[in-house]
């Protein structure tokens, strides 16, 4: 029983090490006016785990920094699509 608790304690202590901050650039071609980036930024900022969002109208892209244990690229692209701006990972 003691070994079980020791193993669980070790796993809990190491778990935060596996978390990683990711940065992804999303292409958002549907942004056609200067107000569009505001909507896209709000949508992405609401995704749990997102720590930073920079949206550029000129390049029609969003650079998003997020905790990959709480958010994913799929959640980010869903958030923009739900806001009316489909996006994809920029290559």
Swiss-Prot record:
Domain of life from the UniProt record: Bacteria
Binding residues annotated for Hg(2+), in chain numbering: 33, 36
Signal peptide: 1-19
Deletion consequences: Mutation decreases resistance to mercury.
Keywords: Mercuric resistance, Mercury, Metal-binding, Periplasm, Plasmid, Signal, Transposable element
InterPro entries xref list: Heavy-metal-associated_CS, HMA_dom, HMA_dom_sf, MerP, MerP/CopZ
Entry's Gene Ontology cellular component terms: periplasmic space
Chief location: periplasm
Subcellular location: Periplasm
GO molecular function: mercury ion binding; mercury ion transmembrane transporter activity
Domain HMA: residue ranges: 22-88
Alphabetical list of Pfam families matching this protein: HMA
SUBUNIT field: Monomer.
Family statement: Belongs to the MerP family.
Stated role: Involved in mercury resistance. Acts as a mercury scavenger that specifically binds to a mercuric ion in the periplasm and probably passes it to the cytoplasmic mercuric reductase MerA via the mercuric transport protein MerT.
Name this polypeptide is given: Mercuric transport protein periplasmic component
Upper lineage: Bacteria, Pseudomonadati, Pseudomonadota, Gammaproteobacteria, Enterobacterales
Gene behind this protein: merP
């Amino acid at each position: 029983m003691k070994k079980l608790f020791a193993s669980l304690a070790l796993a809990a202590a190491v778990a935060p090490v596996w978390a990683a901050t990711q940065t992804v650039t999303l292409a958002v071609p549907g942004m056609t006016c200067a107000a569009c980036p505001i909507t896209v930024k709000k949508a992405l900022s609401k995704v749990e785990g997102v720590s930073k969002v920079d949206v550029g109208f000129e390049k029609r892209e969003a650079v998003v920094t997020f905790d990959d244990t709480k958010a994913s690229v799929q959640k980010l692209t869903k958030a923009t699509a739900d806001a009316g701006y489909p996006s994809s990972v920029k290559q």
